[in-house]
C-alpha cells in the first residue's frame, strides 16, 4: 500500500527537508505541541489545523489528543486508499473501517471494543465539529438514542459495541472483605 497520512508535532525539530517545519509552524500560528497531519500528497488542510488548535480537541488532555490524532491518521489513510478525503467520509466508510479494525481477517492488529469506543469518540468529536462549520455535509458517525439505568436519554454511536466493560473492576469476596475490614480498618 502507498504511504498514508503523516503526523508531525509543532515544536519538534525534524531533519531532512523538514528542518524548518517547527519554525514555520509557529510562524503560522500553530501552538506548541499541536499536531499537524499531512496528506499523502503533501498538503496540510487548514480546517484540520483549525480543529487541532481551536476546538474542544485542543482542550483535551495531552494523552487523549495524542491517541485521537493517531486514530485520525489511520482513518484518513484508510479513506485515502479508498479514494476519498477525510471530508468525504460516509457512513459506509465507517462501517467498513469498523469491520476491518475489529474483525478484519487480514488485519494483523485487530482491536477490542474499548479501543473502538475511543476511536468512535475521536471521530465523533471531529465530524460533529466539521458538520457544525459546514466543512462536511454530515457526520459519518450515526447516533441513536438509548436510555440509561436511571431513564435518561443519551445519544451513542450506532456502531458502539454493547459488550464493552468500562473498567476492570475487581470485586472482593465476602471473606476477603471481612479480612480487609478486620485487618485494614480495625488493626
Could you say what each language-model-derived stretch is?
Residues 29, 145-147, 180:
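Compositionally biased, low-complexity repeat tracts
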Residues 49-63, 73-162, 187:
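N-terminal core-binding DNA-recognition domain of tyrosine recombinases/integrases
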Residues 39, 43, 92, 167-171, ...:
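Alpha-helix boundary/N-cap detector
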Residues 153-187:
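Long, amphipathic, Lys/Arg-enriched alpha-helical "connector/arm" segment
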Residues 72, 123, 173-177:
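A structural signal for well-ordered alpha-helical scaffolds and beta->alpha junctions
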Residues 1-60, 66-73:
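Basic/aromatic DNA-contact patch characteristic of tyrosine site-specific recombinases
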